[in-house]
């Protein structure tokens, strides 16, 4: 019999030739300095989404350990069967209060939250419009829903308005998808203008705020809070796995929406509930976030330091209406960005060399943490300065 997997080796060879293959290995605890590779070597970590350093916070870890001791390691079932725990309801109430919504629903991941919510809200009778730079799971969710799906150029509100004017009247429902903070560039969606269009054309808006959650707005409530925006059309999505240092994703919105998703979002219905440890860790992280402003202040200081340093080096920095912890430096091709990443590692800095198909063009993606020191940023800037001289 012919091997049905004989296509895999050529496919993997193609990944290597295109410089798309990746498999980094970390040792030890998450922190500003981590051990990378085999044999492990210490590098300043500019790849992490643990923006506030809460994944290694003593009180967050203690909460997770205590939850395991009290409730065990797993939820042991889907939440509509045997997997519902008091911790889940407690976490969802805390998220809703934090986000200023009537209710919230916790999923096993941010991707599951997006895929399940989009498929529950729209189908082949409906219209979905999304920013071209949206996270991959928003795009995948739109396609899996079988709705008619159009992308508009990045942050181009005029193009979005034209799509709504041309197509909206032909469909039952309309859902607009956008990141709050775009994950690869760190820029921010023009949410006020998008929400105005949504209200004018009777459209729902799902804002994926994975990278604004915990970082922007009062008490880290996110991009919408930072911009002072609210609307009955909004569906707020965020993660527990980035600034909150745990695992999972959530949807926050009106009570009717959340009740509907509990009975129609397949990625929630058919998944085991979030583990007690993850739920407890997220709750503890939320408490730290809202009671200890020093974490966000430290992150803001490092963002400001790096932004000024990059400008002094003449690096192209995107306009930043809000202080997000993501910076990108374009590269001409995958081979070059891999070389840059290797040279930065030799200088003691671990920076993500991001290539297609994750992004349309290669770039260095720099992310900051609250526990980075001024010296860490200075070392990165010195390494980038040396790199630019050689280019």
Swiss-Prot record:
The answer to keyword Transferase applying to this record is: yes
Q: Which domain of life is it from?
A: Bacteria
InterPro entries, per database record: Aminotrans_II_pyridoxalP_BS, Aminotransferase_I/II_large, AON_synthase_class-II, AONS_Archaea/Proteobacteria, PyrdxlP-dep_Trfase, PyrdxlP-dep_Trfase_major, PyrdxlP-dep_Trfase_small
What are the recorded GO MF terms, alphabetically? 8-amino-7-oxononanoate synthase activity; pyridoxal phosphate binding
E.C. code = 2.3.1.47
Entry keyword annotation includes Isomerase: no
The cofactors it requires, by name, are:
pyridoxal 5'-phosphate
Annotated pathway, please? Answer: Cofactor biosynthesis; biotin biosynthesis
Sites bearing N6-(pyridoxal phosphate)lysine, chain numbering: 242
Binding residues for pyridoxal 5'-phosphate, per the UniProt record? 183, 208-211, 239-242
Listed GO biological process terms: biotin biosynthetic process
Entry-linked NCBIfam families: bioF (TIGR00858)
Oligomer and partners = Homodimer.
Q: What does this protein do?
A: Catalyzes the decarboxylative condensation of pimeloyl-[acyl-carrier protein] and L-alanine to produce 8-amino-7-oxononanoate (AON), [acyl-carrier protein], and carbon dioxide.
User: What's this protein's family per the entry?
Assistant: Belongs to the class-II pyridoxal-phosphate-dependent aminotransferase family. BioF subfamily.
Recorded protein name is Putative 8-amino-7-oxononanoate synthase
Provide the organism lineage as a comma list: Bacteria, Bacillati, Cyanobacteriota, Cyanophyceae, Acaryochloridales
Q: Which gene encodes it?
A: bioF
């Amino acid at each position: 019999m012919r091997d049905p997997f004989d296509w895999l080796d050529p496919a993997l060879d193609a990944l290597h030739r295109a410089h798309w293959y990746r498999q980094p290995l970390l040792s030890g605890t998450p922190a500003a300095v981590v051990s990378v590779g085999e044999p492990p070597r210490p590098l300043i970590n500019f790849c992490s989404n643990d923006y506030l350093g809460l994944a290694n916070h003593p009180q967050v870890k203690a909460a997770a350990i205590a939850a395991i001791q009290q409730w065990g390691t797993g939820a042991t079932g889907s939440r509509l069967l045997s997997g519902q725990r008091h911790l889940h309801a407690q976490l969802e109430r805390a998220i809703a209060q934090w986000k200023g919504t009537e209710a919230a629903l916790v999923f096993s991941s941010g991707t599951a939250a997006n895929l399940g919510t989009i498929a529950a809200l729209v189908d082949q009778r409906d219209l979905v419009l999304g920013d071209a730079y949206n996270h991959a799971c928003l795009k995948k969710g739109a396609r899996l829903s079988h709705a008619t799906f159009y992308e508009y150029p990045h942050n181009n509100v005029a193009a979005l308005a034209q799509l709504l004017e041309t197509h909206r009247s032909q469909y039952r429902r309309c859902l607009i998808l956008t990141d709050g903070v775009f994950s690869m560039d760190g820029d921010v969606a023009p949410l006020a203008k998008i929400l105005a269009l949504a209200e004018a054309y009777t459209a729902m808006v799902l804002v994926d705020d994975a990278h604004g959650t915990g970082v922007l707005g009062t008490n880290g409530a996110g991009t919408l809070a930072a911009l002072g925006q609210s609307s009955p059309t909004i569906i707020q999505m965020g993660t527990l796995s980035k600034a909150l240092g745990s695992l999972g994703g959530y949807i926050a919105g009106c009570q009717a929406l959340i009740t509907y998703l509990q009975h129609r979002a397949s990625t929630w219905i058919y998944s085991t509930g979030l583990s007690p440890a993850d739920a407890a860790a997220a709750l503890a992280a939320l408490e730290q976030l809202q009671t200890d402003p020093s974490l966000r202040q430290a992150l803001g200081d490092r963002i400001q330091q790096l932004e000024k340093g990059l400008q002094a080096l003449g690096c192209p920095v995107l306009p930043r209406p809000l202080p997000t912890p993501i910076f990108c430096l374009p590269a001409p091709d995958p081979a070059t960005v891999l070389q840059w990443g290797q040279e930065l590692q030799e200088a003691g800095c671990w920076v993500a060399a991001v290539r297609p198909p994750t992004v349309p063009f290669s770039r260095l993606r720099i992310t900051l943490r609250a526990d980075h020191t001024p010296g860490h940023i200075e070392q990165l800037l010195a390494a980038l300065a040396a790199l630019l001289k050689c280019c």
